[in-house]
Amino acid sequence: MPRYKTVEQVLSLMKDRTRVRNIGIIAHVDHGKTTTSDTLLAASGIISPKVAGEALALDYLSVEQQRGITVKAANISLYHEAEGKGYVINLIDTPGHVDFSGRVTRSLRVLDGSIVVVDAVEGIMTQTETVLRQSLEERVRPILFINKVDRLVKELKLSPQEMLNRLLDIIRQVNNLIDMYGEPEFKEKWMINPQAGNVIFGSAKDKWGFSLPMAQKKGINMKNVIDAYTASDKSKLEELAAQAPINEALLDAAIKFVPNPIEAQKYRIPKIWKGDLDNELAKAMLNADPNGPIVFMITDMKVDPHAGLVATGRVFSGTLRSGEELWLVNAKTSQRILQVSLYMGPTRELAEEIPAGNIAAVLGLDRARSGETAISVGFSNVQGSFERLHYISEPVVTIAVEPKNPKDLTKMIDALRKLSIEDPNLVVKINEETGEYLLSGMGFLHLEVSLQLLRENYGIDVVTTPPIVVYRESIRAKSQVFEGKSPNKHNKFYLSVEPLNDKTIELISNGTIREDMDSKEMAKILRDEASWDYDEAKRIIAIDENVNVFVDLTSGVQHLREVMDTVLQGFRLAMKEGPLAHEPIRGVKVILHDAVIHEDPAHRGPAQIYPAVRNSIFAGFLTSRPTLLEPIQKLDIRVPADLIGNVTAVITRKRGKILDVSQIANMSRITAEIPVSESYDMASELRGSTGGRAFWGTEFSRWAPVPDSILLDVVTKIRERKGLPKELPKVEDFLS
């Protein structure tokens, strides 16, 4: 099918929202997402059917093709016919490796349905559970595709009955997850049911697949599958692919089970839009109204070497046209659209307009970042934006980088800036003391890929330090009230600190409690769910990005209101670098009990207020059993039953903890936790001790206190690395 014709068809169909489906392909790493996408693209005439499954068209970065994993979420609009009608399917292929799960979270926001790909042999892995949970939290309806069914025949040599049992077991596990994480009103309706047709069995690599209704209609059963793989020649396999093409099975199911934007936005907008649902913007979104005001949710920023920054996202209402002026809610500025296009894999095809319900790529919004909301400029005073995206992981590993050739320094700084625009989970910082450029990522692979992108896209070779694990500082007890004085002695603050309980940390981390919410609503939740005193909770005035809160319990302090912004800035600065090892502070409640403020503004500027606030917080911190928190990783390991002992030995050696061991057929599943600091050579150790027969997944689990037995050693090493004095600060150092 000639490509220009497809683009024309796609553009004309986009206007009929009942014919649009926004779907993503999500899975654990290596379960076959990109191969599945390729097979779908081949059917739409976008890549040659002969190379589908090997072309990895959506893995268009060379780093992806070399490593065989998807790093970026790639978009494409497909044309598909079902029951005589044409449909536009906006397809997003997302990364499965846990280091890139931030990109999955962003792409889910713009989808209405997801194809969950599961390897028939490996079954449900850590990342499958994570992405399915994220999908359900965003009210994205799942369809199941059990891929690599050929492995059950070729590798495990199962009989038809054993194959059926294995497949039913995977379906049961997926339904358990839907039951666990789905919302009450969707659970029943979204359960996976083979009879209904929302589960596909197949092999993306060999291009065949079917649902039960399709198999019954075409007279196919599992015996045909076994015959195709046990036959001496390939003709039976080709016959199977011709009789049950995978693209037909998957796209027909997507059209039948994934709602169109009009249906989906009615129940998804109340979940993801935080703002009044009765205003004109919200009403237009609830109806996916192409004639309403524009609301464009940006999920991805890409640097195009020829065109500059390209913003990709979903049009929830209105119609995007070039020349249109939009207000960027987070950046608080307006910008004009220079060009509107849609993605066909790595290439962008120009479009005159893209209406509500579709995915668009836009030039001109170079001040936007991932997670930005762009709206019609006349609505800039309307309160509301999309709910903050919750990333399952956070950056936990850091390296220092410098260019091999010192002349490349400005080029490297510019390239790092561009990389961090494209990937908000990559944090770039400058160490003020040493002048080093620090790069923090979600894991070792995330940083490796970023360095490879620096080399390939920007031609910069860099020298790096070995990876450093990121820590947090925290406390385990309540402090007394300490007085912090400003350097000129004219301002005094009386503050105390105490640890936040686990429930409060959870409520803030998952976005239930936000700094910008109504104080009464916040106080009610904290009282009912986290045992707070209602009046104290009502007086929370700041929550920072590392889950620390500031409570103002003062009454009638003169001039406090005029300096409160400076006080809060001082609080945020203190939380960025704690006294133990200059690592960020996490999980601390700071209470302001009283203050004395000088009446003359000249004597109460930031240079006076910041140190006074910081000193009393740090004095309290050092008397409250301070500790370091280290990032802990969850491991999900599958291994033949006779090798359990080898795996548990590796985990125990790395300060790990076995959480669960279960048996599935002749494979054992081990769930465990280990500190990220011990995981650097985990892959080679596991491979070595099991002869390469273990496969596993990892994800960020939680922050946990460093054991007391090694605490001082870890703190000393961090202080040495940062060039800080060897001896720890004392309380007296902060009390002048």
From Swiss-Prot:
Q: Does the keyword Nucleotide-binding apply?
A: yes
Subcellular location field: Cytoplasm
According to the UniProt record, list the residues that bear Diphthamide. 603
Entry-linked SUPFAM superfamilies: EF-G C-terminal domain-like (SSF54980), P-loop containing nucleoside triphosphate hydrolases (SSF52540), Ribosomal protein S5 domain 2-like (SSF54211), Translation proteins (SSF50447)
HAMAP family in the record: EF_G_EF_2_A (MF_00054_A)
Q: Which family is annotated?
A: Belongs to the TRAFAC class translation factor GTPase superfamily. Classic translation factor GTPase family. EF-G/EF-2 subfamily.
Task: List, alphabetically, the PANTHER family matched.
Answer: ELONGATION FACTOR-LIKE GTPASE 1 (PTHR42908:SF3), TRANSLATION ELONGATION FACTOR-RELATED (PTHR42908)
Biological role: Catalyzes the GTP-dependent ribosomal translocation step during translation elongation. During this step, the ribosome changes from the pre-translocational (PRE) to the post-translocational (POST) state as the newly formed A-site-bound peptidyl-tRNA and P-site-bound deacylated tRNA move to the P and E sites, respectively. Catalyzes the coordinated movement of the two tRNA molecules, the mRNA and conformational changes in the ribosome.
Q: What is this protein called?
A: Elongation factor 2
Source species: Saccharolobus islandicus (strain L.S.2.15 / Lassen #1) (Sulfolobus islandicus)
Its gene is fusA
